[in-house]
């Protein structure tokens, strides 16, 4: 095994122009890994804590590096991540920051893969690696916390579930993204882009469904395979403690369940993320009972990549899939533990980016390593296509 020789940190910019943490890990036999932490806009209240970048880097240098340098082996991911927890000594990384922790964890994994002369997904995969590749979920139109004066629903997603290859799925999503813009232009609707590169027109949700469904149908006809729709409702952002407020519509929990169930039926949705409040396991269970045989009901803010919350959901029958974001929980080991728990209990695990991203491609490798059915990482934009292009390369070399 290869011992960690040096750990270095620096501030860099993410896709929103905000500072984030980049970590570099070097081993005593020349292995090298570099990784950067992403950052979310609509964050769950139960996520691990992200510290201001300067504080996180200082904590990394003072508390993390001394625990790793000369003491831990890069190839022992569980040992590295245990040392990160020991350096923090809280349950949510509030002492050192989940941003510096996850950057370090991912950089160590890359350094270990470098020493072994294998890809990161091969190093991480082990027994979890199957023969499939994840289908990209691409955000093509939206609003919510990602864009002002746009749709109330945060993300309108597309997934080329019928594509014969990762490459074709990626290209199909990009084509839908362009067709959405063409349709908006035809209707005289201007649209800038939101945080994740999706179009953010000032239209209501009903109009958005028409635009995206029409664009997806055109691309499906052109490419010759199914392109299905999905949603991230980010409902916790719309819940006022009594009702769900989406634009001019106010709905009780029962009405929200009916609304989402109706959307699943009307649009044949492949995926529905955070349709209800992040603390309402009972409502999630009711919706899952209604539509779980037809679509993935995915918990993001509900589970925050946390095994304790996931186990609570499993016990309640809440959702049937989990969104996995390593920075929500702080380490790759914790993320993989959540994936393993989900898989053992019949839940799918969908690996995801954040709205504030970098060119780091670790999540592409994590999705392949763990045989994820979907990877949610946008449709266009340099920090999004970095992951998508990496998926294409991995598929070509596999």
UniProtKB/Swiss-Prot annotation:
It catalyses: (2R)-2-phosphoglycerate = phosphoenolpyruvate + H2O. Its cofactor is Mg(2+). Binds a second Mg(2+) ion via substrate during catalysis. GO terms for cellular component: cell surface; extracellular region; phosphopyruvate hydratase complex. Pathway: Carbohydrate degradation; glycolysis; pyruvate from D-glyceraldehyde 3-phosphate: step 4/5. (2R)-2-phosphoglycerate binds at residues 154, 325, 354-355, 376. GO terms for biological process: glycolytic process. InterPro entries: Enolase, Enolase-like_C_sf, Enolase-like_N, Enolase_C, Enolase_CS, Enolase_N. It is found in: Cytoplasm; Secreted; Cell surface. Mg(2+) binds at residues 232, 273, 300. Its EC number is 4.2.1.11. Pfam families: Enolase_C (PF00113), Enolase_N (PF03952). The active site is at residues 196, 325. Signal peptide: none annotated. This is Enolase. The lineage of its organism: Archaea, Methanobacteriati, Methanobacteriota, Stenosarchaea group, Halobacteria.
